[in-house]
UniProtKB/Swiss-Prot annotation:
It comes from Conus purpurascens (Purple cone). Expressed by the venom duct. This is Mu-conotoxin PIIIA. The modification Pyrrolidone carboxylic acid is found at Q50. Residues 1-19 form the signal peptide. The cysteine framework is III (CC-C-C-CC). Residues 20-49 form a propeptide. One of its GO terms (cellular component) is extracellular region. Mu-conotoxins block voltage-gated sodium channels (Nav). This toxin potently blocks rNav1.4/SCN4A (IC(50)=36-41 nM). It also moderately blocks rNav1.1/SCN1A (IC(50)=120 nM), rNav1.2/SCN2A (IC(50)=620 nM), rNav1.3/SCN3A (IC(50)=3.2 uM), mNav1.6/SCN8A (IC(50)=100 nM). This inhibition is reversible. The block of Nav1.1, Nav1.2, and Nav1.6 is modified when beta-subunits are coexpressed with alpha subunits. Keywords: Amidation, Cleavage on pair of basic residues, Disulfide bond, Hydroxylation, Ion channel impairing toxin, Neurotoxin, Pyrrolidone carboxylic acid, Secreted, Signal, Toxin, Voltage-gated sodium channel impairing toxin.
């Protein structure tokens, strides 16, 4: 009986139950969750910063704004 317990312990250590994929871990489910979060590129902080940086001609001279991304260059 103790040999069976040792074998079971070794098997559980080598292949834990947490290694099995669960239903909530599927990529399709994660995509649906991201879509529900309503995070679009319009609301993304990086996009917002880039738009603010390139909003006026005088801001194109700032160090944060790269001229090749805005001001028609």
């Amino acid at each position: 009986m103790s040999k069976l317990g040792v074998l079971l312990t070794i098997c559980l250590l080598l292949f834990p139950i947490t290694a099995l994929p669960m239903d909530g871990d599927q990529p399709a489910d994660r995509l649906a969750e991201r879509m529900q979060d309503n995070i679009s590129s319009e609301e993304h902080p990086f996009e917002k910063r880039q738009r603010l940086c390139c909003g006026f001609p005088k801001s194109c001279r700032s160090r944060q704004c790269k001229p090749h991304r805005c001001c028609g260059r």
